[in-house]
Amino acid sequence: MTQRRVAITGIEVLAPGGLGRKEFWQLLSEGRTATRGITFFDPAPFRSKVAAEADFCGLENGLSPQEVRRMDRAAQFAVVTARAVEDSGAELAAHPPHRIGVVVGSAVGATMGLDNEYRVVSDGGRLDLVDHRYAVPHLYNYLVPSSFAAEVAWAVGAEGPSTVVSTGCTSGIDAVGIAVELVREGSVDVMVAGAVDAPISPIPCVLDAIKATTPRHDAPATASRPFDSTRNGFVLGEGAAFFVLEELHSARRRGAHIYAEIAGYATRSNAYHMTGLRDGAEMAEAIRLALDEARLNPEQVDYINAHGSGTKQNDRHETAAFKKALGEHAYRTPVSSIKSMVGHSLGAIGSIEIAASALAMEYDVVPPTANLHTPDPECDLDYVPLTARDQRVDSVLTVGSGFGGFQSAMVLTSAQRSTV
């Protein structure tokens, strides 16, 4: 039985630096950074005082006052970004609602909403006991990440499978990977899938306590510097990216614009440590499995969209994994980290990086690694420093690594240049 192939026919992105895939791509292709001093709360108690904040107002982006009151910032991101349906040109009304599904990835859920509500019911933390009378009726929405999938399903009229994936920083890749499998097996006709996180609040800033985030704040624009010898942690970001996924031949029949085919996906875990990483073997295995599913040889990978968080450990771990999986071709393949420009939005970043990968093929441009001036000697691959590179891109490997040992890989190929 021939396996159904899955295409991306719609993309929408909300990221630091702009709402919309065009603004997002312009920032990446120009190598600009969106990092600044934190404005959402007073960061004085924390080592890290910079973040990549998104300029966003729900009311200015089509949400009603009632929706803004009901939804946490992350849920608002998800609903607005689910407008990828519009980009796809897909007539969802032509499909039975139960043949349309939703998968949303998120690492930390509605942390900003929870933090705000705690401040209200505790009088800014001054009360020994919280006063539940001040709790908003929709507080439950903040407590359950499943509300993200529910809000997106309501927004697009999906009555098929609807679920949330929470695998730390690989959530965005895993959410799309699971959605691809549902289309492949014929359970649905269309999936709206992606990931979201809005973690810039004191709650996720406890990452500061384990020194995962950078303390560099004297020059915010240069704070995120993956693979550089002076890197000292990542910059927290926020955002969302969502996709419309359809069976490839069906999308071609209706004349859809096809950004990419998702040809391979795999995930592994190291069963080792919550934050520690070993020698890259598990990520390398995920890469090999994704390439096998895509029926690609290592030599056919044109670009690697790295996890590239900017921690000493992760960047070296990834470099080792690429060498294990691709062999000598790793040295000939451009690798870059867009976290150098848009920060690390935890569960959302995997989907944001999938969007960047698809757009790299759309425009035949490899985005750069910003702020890479002095490469770490142990990170000795081609990390596309500072400036984007024009080159033909027919296939992209994008990878993610998450706390808990999660390692995921996805292969995108150019369906536009394939007649199969």
Swiss-Prot record:
<dbReference type="GO" id="GO:0005829">
    <property type="term" value="C:cytosol"/>
</dbReference>
<dbReference type="InterPro" id="IPR014030">
    <property type="entry name" value="Ketoacyl_synth_N"/>
</dbReference>
<protein>
    <recommendedName>
        <fullName>Putative polyketide beta-ketoacyl synthase 1</fullName>
        <ecNumber>2.3.1.-</ecNumber>
    </recommendedName>
</protein>
<feature type="active site" description="For beta-ketoacyl synthase activity">
    <location>
        <position position="307"/>
    </location>
</feature>
<keyword id="KW-0012">Acyltransferase</keyword>
<feature type="active site" description="For beta-ketoacyl synthase activity">
    <location>
        <position position="169"/>
    </location>
</feature>
<dbReference type="InterPro" id="IPR014031">
    <property type="entry name" value="Ketoacyl_synth_C"/>
</dbReference>
<dbReference type="InterPro" id="IPR018201">
    <property type="entry name" value="Ketoacyl_synth_AS"/>
</dbReference>
<dbReference type="GO" id="GO:0017000">
    <property type="term" value="P:antibiotic biosynthetic process"/>
</dbReference>
<dbReference type="GO" id="GO:0004315">
    <property type="term" value="F:3-oxoacyl-[acyl-carrier-protein] synthase activity"/>
</dbReference>
<comment type="pathway">
    <text>Antifungal biosynthesis; monensin biosynthesis.</text>
</comment>
<feature type="active site" description="For beta-ketoacyl synthase activity">
    <location>
        <position position="344"/>
    </location>
</feature>
<dbReference type="Pfam" id="PF00109">
    <property type="entry name" value="ketoacyl-synt"/>
</dbReference>
<keyword id="KW-0045">Antibiotic biosynthesis</keyword>
<dbReference type="InterPro" id="IPR000794">
    <property type="entry name" value="Beta-ketoacyl_synthase"/>
</dbReference>
<dbReference type="Pfam" id="PF02801">
    <property type="entry name" value="Ketoacyl-synt_C"/>
</dbReference>
<feature type="domain" description="Ketosynthase family 3 (KS3)">
    <location>
        <begin position="3"/>
        <end position="414"/>
    </location>
</feature>
<comment type="similarity">
    <text>Belongs to the thiolase-like superfamily. Beta-ketoacyl-ACP synthases family.</text>
</comment>
<dbReference type="GO" id="GO:0006633">
    <property type="term" value="P:fatty acid biosynthetic process"/>
</dbReference>
<keyword id="KW-0808">Transferase</keyword>
<dbReference type="InterPro" id="IPR016039">
    <property type="entry name" value="Thiolase-like"/>
</dbReference>
<dbReference type="InterPro" id="IPR020841">
    <property type="entry name" value="PKS_Beta-ketoAc_synthase_dom"/>
</dbReference>
